[in-house]
Amino acid sequence: MSVRLQDARRVIDAAEKKAAQIGQPMNIAVADEGGNLVAHVRMDGAWIGSVDISIKKAYTSRAFDIATKDLATHSQSGGQFFGIHASNNGRIMIFAGGIPLKRDGKVVGAIGVSGGSGEQDHAVAEARAAAFCRGHGRPGAPFATASPGHAGP
């Protein structure tokens, strides 16, 4: 079962709280299993230019079922995915901040976060993805509190 709107709202709400906790306004996007945008929020004060980036991070993470931070590592010059950012009509984003969302071990969507440093974007996305996974991604399941150092999905 794909990420539904109620799932996306809960993920975004939790991500907004994490972003506020670190003092960084952000754009937060959630995509479904087809990589389609389910929901997006631009926090007050978040960069307008990061709207598109957050959406593309969610798409990229779902399209390849990998954290965009990890894809970025593999897409550097000499890496096995060098040049991938130019594929898919420019929809691929290789900045940190995109993380797959899993339900019962299967990728069902992704979160994309943009507006801070790469480390901040990744930390907010990772904490929310980890909470989604620990709640088994079931609609209505409570989120567990994620620590910033959690290894992720």
Language-model-detected regions and their locations in the chain:
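N-terminal polybasic/positive-inside topogenic patches
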Residues: T145-G152
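Flexible, solvent-exposed loop/hinge segments and secondary-structure transition points
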Residues: M1-F143
